[in-house]
């Protein structure tokens, strides 16, 4: 609060990024327009938009690191600034001074809130409640009637807390008038004369679920669409389309330059879209992906449900030379996390319906088009020293039903030393397939769901066939029993030998229909140059 007050008085024009805001390449971007004091509400908005904020009066030992060190102090400063603006007469500063004197060289039983309440009484009862509030806040305003110079606006409180609400009224000459609505809880209609625009919570003293509904005018506000290179912060008065140049590659499409178009900003919003068109230099065709996502965060933090996500996605690329594929995959994902936000425990329950349409070749393929209903459960708990992951997968198709579980454990038992263990168990409950296209793979990723970035997905030999994806059997070596159409049990492990050099081993039990159980074994050296991104076996 004191820093906000100091900057406001002595450096009101200080930009958040200082002199860099004047650089020609960024001077028109939203973040270059932010003042120094805007950082407090920006960081608060970023965390609140992810549904991981915590009440200001939470005990320190219950706060996450980011909330303890950054967000809650920022929110506290903004809250005191709102009280100071609402009450006036420098009441906050006087209470801070009194509290400092009472605690000079001695320890007093009185908290700052005790002193503040003593000096202001019931005028700040709402403030005490705000410190404890742990839910979404959202106010909105819209015009409901306009007769000559008399206009009526409806202000709605879409949350369950009573707060004083600051509003700014502007006329045609852009002259502004500010007033407060005291203890705002229920919906309110206000009459405005000779003003043509109203803004609620103009200083953004508290984070809201949606700031775009904080503006209204006697005339319909026409938002312009702006194309913005790279991501930026949201401008509530414009529709922004962010675009980023992209370059992708696979063996059949060649180099694919393109663009990624999205509405994603650092402050998350409920609905996000991403279009990624690209041009195949090898096929001379326009390809790409489209993804739509709607996130509904659970405002009730007394249960473990964190969010519900709705996805719709589609893509088109080539799986062989001159043979294209198209996918369509709607899904619902339920995300769970511990009520103790400091816990790293996460759970995900998802349901996907994947439709694949493959261009047929002259030799014909048994499954050019197919649909799979996929259920997945993931439980993970990771820390700096240890990482645990459990995944259960269940797939249903008209010709097969298969289920699998995967267990991963990684332990950094010393500096730059680790060991890891992975167990995979997969079983066909029903299998009427004609070939091994949907079978469990012992050493190659069978990406018939087209969800993995394989550079040469149809290659059986050569450099591109050696791309390793840790799935199913998880073997790095090519073995005689490539597939399992009944069940497979695979155990893989590794341990650090020296710095980024590791030894690995694996053993697998592979069972095919009408064949005896077969055991396979492997061992070798892993060059762990960049974990999970660049490794050589």
Residue ranges and their predicted role:
Residues 455, 516-537:
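C-terminal beta-signal and terminal closure region of outer-membrane beta-barrel proteins
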Residues 177, 181-183, 239-251, 257-259, ...:
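Transmembrane beta-strand segments that form the barrel wall of outer-membrane beta-barrel proteins
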Residues 489-497, 504-507, 523-531:
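Conserved C-terminal beta-signal and adjacent last beta-strands/turns
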Residues 1-157, 162, 172-177:
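Hydrophobic alpha-helical and helix-loop surface patches within well-folded domains
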Residues 12, 309-320, 327-333, 359, ...:
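C-terminal outer-membrane beta-barrel translocator/porin domains of Gram-negative envelope proteins
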Residues 164, 168-188:
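Solvent-exposed beta-strand/loop surfaces of large extracellular or lumenal domains
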Residues 182, 188-194, 199-304, 333-335, ...:
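Outer-membrane beta-barrel initiation region
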């Amino acid at each position: 609060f004191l820093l906000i007050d100091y900057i406001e008085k002595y450096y009101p024009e200080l930009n958040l990024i200082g002199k860099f805001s004047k650089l020609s390449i960024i001077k028109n971007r939203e973040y270059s327009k932010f003042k120094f004091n805007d950082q407090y509400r920006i960081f608060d908005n970023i965390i609140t938009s992810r549904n991981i904020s915590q009440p200001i009066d939470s005990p320190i030992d219950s706060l996450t690191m980011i909330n303890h060190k950054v967000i809650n102090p920022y929110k506290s400063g903004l809250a005191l600034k709102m009280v100071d603006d609402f009450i006036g007469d420098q009441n906050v500063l006087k209470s801070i001074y009194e509290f400092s004197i009472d605690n000079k060289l001695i320890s007093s039983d009185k908290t700052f809130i005790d002193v503040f309440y003593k000096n202001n009484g019931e005028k700040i009862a709402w403030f005490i409640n705000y410190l404890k509030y742990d839910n979404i806040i959202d106010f909105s305003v819209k015009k409901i009637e306009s007769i000559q110079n008399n206009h009526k606006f409806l202000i709605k409180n879409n949350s369950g807390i009573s707060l004083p609400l600051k509003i700014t009224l502007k006329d045609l000459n852009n002259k502004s008038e500010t007033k407060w609505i005291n203890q705002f809880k229920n919906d309110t209609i206000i009459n405005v004369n000779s003003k043509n625009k109203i803004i609620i919570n103009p200083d953004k003293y508290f984070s809201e679920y949606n700031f775009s509904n904080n503006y209204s005018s006697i005339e319909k506000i026409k938002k312009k669409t702006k194309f913005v290179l790279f991501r930026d912060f949201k401008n509530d008065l414009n529709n922004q389309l962010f675009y980023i140049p992209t370059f992708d590659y696979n063996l059949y499409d060649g180099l694919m330059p393109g663009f990624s178009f999205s509405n994603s900003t650092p402050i998350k919003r409920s609905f996000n879209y991403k279009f990624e068109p690209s041009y195949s230099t090898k096929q001379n065709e326009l390809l790409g992906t489209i993804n739509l996502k709607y996130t509904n965060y659970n405002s009730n933090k007394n249960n473990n449900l964190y969010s519900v996500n709705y996805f719709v996605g589609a893509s088109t690329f080539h799986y062989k030379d001159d043979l294209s594929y198209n996918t369509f995959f709607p899904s619902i994902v339920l995300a769970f996390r511990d009520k103790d936000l400091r816990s790293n425990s996460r759970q995900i329950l998802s349901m996907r319906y994947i439709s694949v349409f493959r261009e047929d070749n002259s030799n014909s393929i048994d499954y050019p088009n197919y649909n799979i209903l996929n259920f997945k459960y993931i439980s993970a708990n990771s820390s700096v020293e240890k990482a645990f992951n459990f995944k259960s997968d269940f797939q249903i198709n008209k010709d097969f039903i298969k289920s699998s579980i995967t267990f991963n454990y990684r332990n950094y038992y010393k500096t730059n030393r680790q060991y890891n263990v992975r167990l995979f168990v997969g079983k066909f409950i029903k299998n009427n397939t004609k070939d091994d296209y949907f079978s469990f793979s012992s050493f190659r990723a069978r990406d018939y769901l087209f969800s993995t970035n394989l550079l040469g997905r149809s290659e059986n030999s050569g450099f591109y066939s050696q791309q390793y994806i840790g799935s199913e059997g998880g073997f790095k070596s090519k073995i005689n029993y490539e597939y399992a159409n009944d069940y497979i049990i695979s155990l893989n492990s590794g341990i650090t030998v020296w710095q980024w050099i590791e030894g690995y081993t694996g053993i697998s039990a592979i069972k095919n229909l009408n064949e005896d159980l077969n055991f396979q074994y492997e061992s070798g050296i892993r060059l762990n140059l960049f974990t999970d991104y660049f490794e050589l076996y």
